[in-house]
Amino acid sequence: MAKGEGAESGSAAGLLPTSILQSTERPAQVKKEPKKKKQQLSVCNKLCYALGGAPYQVTGCALGFFLQIYLLDVAQKDEEVVFCFSSFQVGPFSASIILFVGRAWDAITDPLVGLCISKSPWTCLGRLMPWIIFSTPLAVIAYFLIWFVPDFPHGQTYWYLLFYCLFETMVTCFHVPYSALTMFISTEQTERDSATAYRMTVEVLGTVLGTAIQGQIVGQADTPCFQDLNSSTVASQSANHTHGTTSHRETQKAYLLAAGVIVCIYIICAVILILGVREQREPYEAQQSEPIAYFRGLRLVMSHGPYIKLITGFLFTSLAFMLVEGNFVLFCTYTLGFRNEFQNLLLAIMLSATLTIPIWQWFLTRFGKKTAVYVGISSAVPFLILVALMESNLIITYAVAVAAGISVAAAFLLPWSMLPDVIDDFHLKQPHFHGTEPIFFSFYVFFTKFASGVSLGISTLSLDFAGYQTRGCSQPERVKFTLNMLVTMAPIVLILLGLLLFKMYPIDEERRRQNKKALQALRDEASSSGCSETDSTELASIL
């Protein structure tokens, strides 16, 4: 398992600089090294890069919380509201098809886009920036049309399915190259880590912003629940007209207004990213004539031990946090009885996460990333146990929400901070292959979305077996118990499994420092005017 991991990193750090930098044929190279290390990003550059993460989070949060209720209650013509059994409206089955197909397509597009990016040539704008530039107009158009109710009776399901899948494709064409851009904004590990901390702060704020904008503008669209003849509680569509403060048409306009605001945020953030960030090419990469073939690169990436261990560990921890996220509103509403407080609890979690991301950035710089993983993610366990055992208490629930936000911040920051270390390690072992960065990032996003789909399926099936009543004001005790397990016990088990896998992750702080020295020697050798293919062959043999 670990036959040569320590030895390989040691040789990369020790033999590489000695064999290359001490060459008597290039004595001036050592004198140039201090200047090459000054590749710091300004705060403005980091903010411009960080703002590029907001569109994905703002739109994803709005769709995640509101698309289902929009398809069921709003995506129909005015005359169909009264005749709630009209065959022309988007019913629950059609809505489930739209949501499932859209989510599945979203996961599939990540490796497909990664494939296309890996084959993209380097242009005057870079390799990644053209994807961000040309996907933005199509993404905002598709997003706006998702929230538009077409004025024709037939084919509404196809309308929403088309534009939902189109938007997911375009936002993937934006987000995958944006994620891979981390490797090209700077060659310094510390600068990339700092920029990642800025990015995670903005992305957490983006989730808060998406929820706030959509919730405040379309909050009137919520349907109340009523008691039926069997003493169970169901929602009434006609109640929207009796108890709502806006008409159905005004509700549709409210969704369009919210979409327009979010589209403006998307465009502004994309423009700032494009104008404020310059994609930098590695000197040693420029010597290669063309990128590695995709499937060969995929085989090399998937055989890279640190990457597999990293994504497997985060797959379990991501699944844990997504189970909590997907069932938190239902848990607060039915198990804890805080129907009117869940919005504020969500806000407490996200604000806590936003405020603590800089603290985690300092922590991982001071104590190392593996230590930050253990401390940050495991800190959620005692609070989940407390939630499982305590009685319904609003003050304690708020305290737990704030504490949970601290762990959420670590879960947001650490994967994106550790992925560049894995890619650096890969580049040292495969110095002649480039263009694999989109593969690393796209497959990490793919596995994250896979975890999201699994958590959604597990939750839905579990609640269905427990007898969940759709849109009920209360639920049977079995449903409350199931929600308790989904939000507390199941995530605890998954977190412990993930932390166990992280024990096998080989890149610690010492290995990171060794890799940094070896990469710097590789860059200096490649950028030197006297660099030859003989030296590159020597470098590959040493590594």
From Swiss-Prot:
GO terms for molecular function: fatty acid transmembrane transporter activity; long-chain fatty acid transmembrane transporter activity; lysophosphatidylcholine flippase activity; lysophospholipid:sodium symporter activity; oleate transmembrane transporter activity; phospholipid transporter activity. Its main location: membrane. It is found in: Cell membrane; Endoplasmic reticulum membrane. Residues 1-40, 116-127, 183-189, 276-306, 364-367, 430-439, 503-543 are cytoplasmic. The gene is MFSD2A. Gene3D superfamilies: MFS general substrate transporter like domains. Signal peptide: none annotated. Belongs to the major facilitator superfamily. SUPFAM superfamilies: MFS general substrate transporter. Keywords: Cell membrane, Disease variant, Disulfide bond, Endoplasmic reticulum, Glycoprotein, Lipid transport, Membrane, Primary microcephaly, Symport, Transmembrane, Transmembrane helix, Transport. It catalyses: a 1-acyl-sn-glycero-3-phosphocholine(in) + Na(+)(in) = a 1-acyl-sn-glycero-3-phosphocholine(out) + Na(+)(out); 1-(4Z,7Z,10Z,13Z,16Z,19Z-docosahexaenoyl)-sn-glycero-3-phosphocholine(in) + Na(+)(in) = 1-(4Z,7Z,10Z,13Z,16Z,19Z-docosahexaenoyl)-sn-glycero-3-phosphocholine(out) + Na(+)(out); 1-(9Z-octadecenoyl)-sn-glycero-3-phosphocholine(in) + Na(+)(in) = 1-(9Z-octadecenoyl)-sn-glycero-3-phosphocholine(out) + Na(+)(out); 1-hexadecanoyl-sn-glycero-3-phosphocholine(in) + Na(+)(in) = 1-hexadecanoyl-sn-glycero-3-phosphocholine(out) + Na(+)(out). Changing R103 to A/K/E: Reduced lysophosphatidylcholine (LPC) transport. Changing C473A: Reduced lysophosphatidylcholine (LPC) transport. It is linked to Neurodevelopmental disorder with progressive microcephaly, spasticity, and brain imaging abnormalities: An autosomal recessive disorder characterized by impaired intellectual development with poor speech, progressive microcephaly, and appendicular spasticity. Brain imaging usually shows abnormalities, including enlarged ventricles, white matter defects, and atrophy or hypoplasia of brain tissue. Some patients have a more severe phenotype with seizures, lack of developmental milestones, and early death. The chain crosses the membrane at residues 41-70, 95-115, 128-147, 158-182, 190-221, 242-275, 307-333, 345-363, 368-389, 393-429, 440-466, 479-502. Changing E325 to A/D/Q/R: Abolished lysophosphatidylcholine (LPC) transport. Changing N240Q: Loss of glycosylation. Changing F412 to I/W: Reduced lysophosphatidylcholine (LPC) transport. It is a multi-pass membrane protein. This is Sodium-dependent lysophosphatidylcholine symporter 1. Changing R339A: Reduced lysophosphatidylcholine (LPC) transport. One of its GO terms (cellular component) is cytosol. Interacts with ERVFRD-1/syncytin-2. Residues 71-94, 148-157, 222-241, 334-344, 390-392, 467-478 are extracellular. Changing F342A: Abolished lysophosphatidylcholine (LPC) transport.
